Amino acid sequence: MALSTVESFVAQQLELLELERDAEVEERRSWQEHSSLKELQSRGVCLLKLQVSSQCTGLYGQRLVTFEPRKLGPVVVLPSNSFTSGDIVGLYDANESSQLATGVLTRITQKSVTVAFDESHDFQLNLDRENTYRLLKLANDVTYKRLKKALMTLKKYHSGPASSLIDVLLGGSSPSPTTEIPPFTFYNTALDPSQKEAVSFALAQKEVAIIHGPPGTGKTTTVVEIILQAVKQGLKILCCAPSNVAVDNLVERLALCKKRILRLGHPARLLESAQQHSLDAVLARSDNAQIVADIRKDIDQVFGKNKKTQDKREKSNFRNEIKLLRKELKEREEAAIVQSLTAADVVLATNTGASSDGPLKLLPENHFDVVVVDECAQALEASCWIPLLKAPKCILAGDHRQLPPTTISHKAALAGLSRSLMERLVEKHGAGAVRMLTVQYRMHQAITRWASEAMYHGQLTAHPSVAGHLLKDLPGVADTEETSVPLLLIDTAGCGLLELDEEDSQSKGNPGEVRLVTLHIQALVDAGVHAGDIAVIAPYNLQVDLLRQSLSNKHPELEIKSVDGFQGREKEAVILTFVRSNRKGEVGFLAEDRRINVAVTRARRHVAVICDSRTVNNHAFLKTLVDYFTEHGEVRTAFEYLDDIVPENYTHEGSQGHSHAPKPRGPVTSIRKPTNEQENGQEARAAAGQGRRKPNERPPGSQVHSQPSSGARGCDRTGAIDRTEHFRAMIEGFVASKESQLEFPASLSSHDRLLVHQIAEEHGLRHDSTGEGKARHITVSRKSPAGSGGVAPQLPSPPSPAQAEPEPLSQQPLGQPHCSTQLDLKALHLQRLQRQQGSQAQPAKAQPGVGLHPQKTQQKKKKKETKGPALPCEEDFDALVSAVIKADNTCSFAKCTASTTTLGQFCMHCSRRYCLSHHLPEIHGCGEKARAHARQMISREGVLYAGSGTRDRALDPAKRAQLQRRLDKKLGELSSQRTSKRKEKERGT
């Protein structure tokens, strides 16, 4: 390879690293100078108000201190943060700015954080359990120096074991043809064909082999098999990864295979299961351990003698003796380290831990035969070059379609710093150096199909063992609407659940989506799903905090994290809250496609996405996700959860009617979304308008038409049009016939039932959707003339009070195209009230609308209780207009019939009129919007005003002077009165 190519590559990488380093230093400086402690905590780099919960001595004499948040309430959890195991942190007293000590973070949970302090802090660090402390993440100079040193070594590398590898990796030459390898037996006989092909390919490659492992495909299993086969061939392996967690994962897997492994790194950064394989632990078990301990004891004794004596000659002798002892100690320790390193078949370390300024400097240059870099796609390319220079062959494993390397400098990332070595080589060499694992063992096939089509060119398939598994298949989990679907989309479009509009906030939150998440989790838990099997993923720290405040106390085992915290993890159910809901259509952090891929593919059996489709559809990739869930999953609107959300803003007046009704744990129904051409608001109302009731017996004289099962949900637009025309022809044939009813089979999908509802409404027919689950079917019948038998099917009239026996919602028309939005929304809420009242009805009570000739007492009772005209069944435009006008002149609060023609207040938040009893936003359900509006006004003007919220006017200067004179005069009079009284008192004495 031309020297200029290596030099230009190194120069570019050094420049990018310098930009990254400058950005990190500037960020830290800016935080310390301009950010308050609360702002630092909101950024995730500081933890405030911590108390010491326990102290103990850890491995090799280290002091482990566990901190917990100060207990001020029932929920004691740490705020959302970016701390991870291995971070260098500074400990500060809560009331002081000086740093008490520096330590290494060893463990962090939702409720506590543990820090390891060196022995040097034993006597200086006195921590009181009653005091409060804070932890601040510190910049790490060591990593930057090691990256820079590795690049300079690469620049000067002329001859050595890695010469051919450098030639291939930097583009000077193509990988050599594969060599023939002798037949071998797999340690793991359960490997699938793609995994076996990857193992054989990696062993046969001469310079480089890339294992592309999408989520759940057993990448680590494949890497372990490759390492075991290489060790069997007598090769020495250096295995690295960018994080301690990834390295320890490999340590655990290899330890089960009884191979000689050695883990390099700070003991405090290692998992407990990996600490017994650490270098310090191995040295403690070696033959030289006792000799080394004796030498250290001798050094301590000489130090003690040196302190006691005052004679200069003796002090000089003691110092010389200490030098000799230290020299002997160093020699014996290095000999023990070399012995341990050479005896190990596999040495494991992080990329930076494999640096030549560590224990590996004691080994010869050609000691290792193969370097394995796991999770290569998450590592900066410069960090990969630290281990790559130590062997002639490398095996890279990872997934460049998941999270990229983490960077701070946006400029450096755009210039190429966020582009990993694996991504660059895949684009450069393609199939000549890459083998992809194509069978995944984690996700339901519906989840797999989206990831495969969106990110992996359709090559990813689900193993039969997981292709159809659902939450309901878990032990003790009931078969419910939530546990029987792999994909669920809860759409908040048009429901007013906007993100928090805070200009000064660095993060985003959405309280409305938090409540939807809470309701869905409760539905899953009630069905028997263990909270520890559920993960909630949010893209913003503020949303994570809101979720933890709402859920952690009730479900302590529930994991709530950002996307970065779940890389490499999996859960039975995953709930994603996208947060963003705004009129500008801004998606912000969500625009990173790979983050969404990671979030969705953490789930095994169930994925629920809560988002505003109008906002996220402005991003092409997110639109494909929403469209896929719409086509292949269950779609619900937040309106279906409105019963559980709105009453929080109501007073007792609005909830008396259903105060004894059990609170529903989830939505009452779910339908698949209609075509994309429909407006989201219409979709929401149409979805919420279909209620459920028990399936009725088929009446005589009904006409039954069979319909092929529509189980294949991935239908194209042409198929949807064909089905629409088919249903239209069936209904038009029914209209022309003399049959009284037309019944459709239960094999129709929810989308097909929606089409039938719409077509029946167009023809002025009555359409009932009855039954639950797979037994749900539609019956279309002719409408009875108004007044026949004194009873007519009615829509709930907005101004009318609650009816004694409300008509089932399935008998209501799906939508009224001529009605205003106000009328639709109010009718929607009345329908929900009716559902709750209907759930309390006695079983012996006759169902409304079953017979055309009810008892006279029932007729009288219904006539007496029914107030206000009902909307006509026929499409009478004048009657509809009259109903809308009457609704506009009636209080829009549920169950209130007060007139607002003379006295009424208009709500600026929901654009409706209310009577004086319900006009306050907190009463009729606009409390959140009112508070958000008030916060916006305060944020915009920067002043919090008392009273009406108007700015206090400054007094006129002349009037102010007059008032000041009157005040001075009054004060003078009072002062003179006190003086005269004092004199009179003195005279009397």
Curated annotation (Swiss-Prot):
Pfam families: AAA_11, AAA_12, R3H, SMUBP-2_HCS1_1B, zf-AN1. Keywords: Acetylation, Activator, ATP-binding, Cell projection, Cytoplasm, DNA-binding, Helicase, Hydrolase, Metal-binding, Nucleotide-binding, Nucleus, Phosphoprotein, Ribonucleoprotein, RNA-binding, Transcription, Transcription regulation, tRNA-binding, Zinc, Zinc-finger. InterPro entries: AAA+_ATPase, AN1-like_Znf, Coronavir_polyprotein_1ab, DNA2/NAM7-like_C, DNA2/NAM7_AAA_11, Helicase_ATP-bd, P-loop_NTPase, R3H_dom. It comes from the Eukaryota. SUPFAM superfamilies: AN1-like Zinc finger (SSF118310), P-loop containing nucleoside triphosphate hydrolases (SSF52540), R3H domain (SSF82708). The modification N-acetylalanine is found at residue 2. 5' to 3' helicase that unwinds RNA and DNA duplexes in an ATP-dependent reaction. Specific to 5'-phosphorylated single-stranded guanine-rich sequences. May play a role in RNA metabolism, ribosome biogenesis or initiation of translation. May play a role in regulation of transcription. Interacts with tRNA-Tyr. This is DNA-binding protein SMUBP-2. The lineage of its organism: Eukaryota, Metazoa, Chordata, Craniata, Vertebrata.
